[in-house]
């Protein structure tokens, strides 16, 4: 679990997301409260439940980006899912219980990667010993714990030095590698993912891994042997137990597009299904027990963050019980022309820096003047005003159209420097941005 303070979390989010201070603060406090709860003693700790968050705002203002960046900062089991993927039990489609199953799978994968990183130094040492055994088969008795004979020790150390310096990387050796059986893929019918997963696991357990001798270059052999030794060092039962506990205590679920499962004033059969999804979500958000192949998972302390544009619906269109499960509501603001300018220049991976890096691979130096950046921001903002407001995503469309000629003829322009100024921006985009019809279909 991340030990970052709310200020540190907001500072990290500021590197990638412009504005939306209220949303960043709410998410930062919620993430910090996960850590605070762990410091509280029992039985009070069990009574402290997370305060779920509902983020409301138009498309393209940073709701999903906050979730993506939060996933990297959280250092906890995290899953982002679209609410529209799920249907009421009895309808064709995925049921909401699969959210928790997917979260557990994510936690298992995360825990395995963490263990592999932790065991890598020891795994590399073991892989090195196996390569030396293959190079000097008589220098060692069988088994890792056996000591090399005194007379061959000097030779072994010489080979070890050459191996570490990369002098033997292209030499071929015969090594035994554990070959896992090819996994049998079973396509799950809607609503039967858990049963299919159990059947697939049964078939995998039936096929035992076999050892196979292969002739490989030392460079390739080292990589394969390190992976094999790292996997051997993992205690699978302990890993699964810790991952399940981590999900129950620190898991975070990001429910995107929750406004798409709201019911509107006019009732239709699809609205009934949407209400069913909301009712199915209720016990999950409130706290229930879900059966998975790794055991029973309690959802009482899993944090749920929901988001939606709420263009055609209002948060009050959610069923009252579900509204009550998201006590913290945050409204995200529409982006201004100044916000667009900051998005173009002030984030760590801003669009201008991305396009400069892409075209540099073709030998093209791309420079943007200050007035060009301001003009791009103005055009993106005005097109959003006169057509559909798609937020920061409009900048991608504008930048692609602006640099279309340079990107297409990159080989011809190789070795040159291009300065993008306001005049060039107007030449490429001026007419398009001024005509509502052209802007609607081109930008």
UniProtKB/Swiss-Prot annotation:
GO terms for molecular function: ATP binding; ATP hydrolysis activity; peptidase activity; proteasome-activating activity. GO terms for biological process: protein unfolding; proteolysis involved in protein catabolic process. The keyword Ribosomal protein does not apply. Coiled coil: none annotated. One of its GO terms (cellular component) is HslUV protease complex. Belongs to the ClpX chaperone family. HslU subfamily. This is ATP-dependent protease ATPase subunit HslU. It comes from Nitrosomonas eutropha (strain DSM 101675 / C91 / Nm57). The lineage of its organism: Bacteria, Pseudomonadati, Pseudomonadota, Betaproteobacteria, Nitrosomonadales. The gene is hslU.
């Amino acid at each position: 679990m991340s030990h970052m303070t709310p200020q540190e979390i907001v500072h990290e989010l500021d590197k990638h997301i412009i504005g939306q201070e209220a949303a960043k603060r709410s998410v930062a406090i919620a993430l910090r409260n996960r850590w605070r709860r762990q410091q509280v003693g029992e039985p009070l700790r069990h009574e402290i439940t997370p305060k779920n968050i509902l983020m409301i705002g138009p498309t393209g203002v940073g709701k999903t980006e906050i979730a993506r960046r939060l996933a990297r900062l959280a250092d906890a089991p995290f899953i982002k899912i679209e609410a529209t993927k799920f249907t009421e039990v009895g309808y064709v489609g995925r049921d909401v219980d699969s959210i928790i199953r997917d979260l557990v799978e994510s936690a298992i994968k995360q825990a395995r990667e963490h263990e592999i990183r932790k065991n890598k130094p020891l795994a590399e040492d073991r892989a090195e010993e196996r390569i030396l055994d293959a190079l000097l088969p008589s220098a060692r008795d069988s088994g890792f714990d056996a000591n090399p004979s005194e007379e061959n020790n000097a030779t072994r150390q010489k080979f070890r030095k050459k191996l570490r310096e990369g002098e033997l990387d292209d030499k071929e050796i015969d090594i035994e590698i554990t070959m896992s059986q090819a996994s049998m893929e079973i396509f799950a019918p809607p609503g039967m993912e858990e049963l299919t997963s159990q059947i697939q696991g049964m078939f995998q357990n039936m096929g035992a891994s076999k050892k196979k001798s292969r002739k490989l270059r030392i460079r390739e052999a080292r990589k394969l042997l390190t992976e094999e030794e790292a996997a051997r060092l993992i205690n699978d039962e302990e890993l699964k137990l810790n991952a399940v506990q981590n999900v129950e205590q620190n898991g975070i679920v990001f429910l995107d597009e929750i406004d798409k499962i709201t019911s509107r004033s006019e009732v239709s059969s699809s609205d009934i299904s949407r209400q069913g999804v909301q009712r199915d979500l209720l016990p999950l958000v409130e706290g229930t027990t879900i059966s998975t192949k790794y055991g029973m998972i309690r959802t009482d302390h899993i944090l749920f963050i929901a988001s939606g544009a709420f263009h055609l619906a209002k948060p009050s269109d959610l069923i009252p019980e579900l509204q009550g499960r998201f006590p913290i509501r945050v409204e995200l603001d529409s982006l201004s022309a100044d916000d667009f300018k900051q998005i173009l220049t002030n984030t760590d991976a801003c669009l201008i820096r991305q396009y400069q890096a892409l075209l540099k691979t073709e030998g093209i130096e791309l420079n943007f003047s200050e007035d060009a950046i301001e003009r791009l921001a103005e055009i993106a903002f005005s097109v959003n005003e006169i057509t559909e407001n798609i937020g920061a995503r409009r900048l991608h469309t504008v930048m692609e159209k602006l640099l279309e000629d340079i990107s297409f003829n990159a080989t011809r322009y190789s070795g040159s420097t291009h300065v993008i100024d306001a005049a060039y921006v107007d030449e490429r985009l001026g007419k398009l941005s001024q005509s509502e019809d052209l802007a609607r279909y081109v930008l």
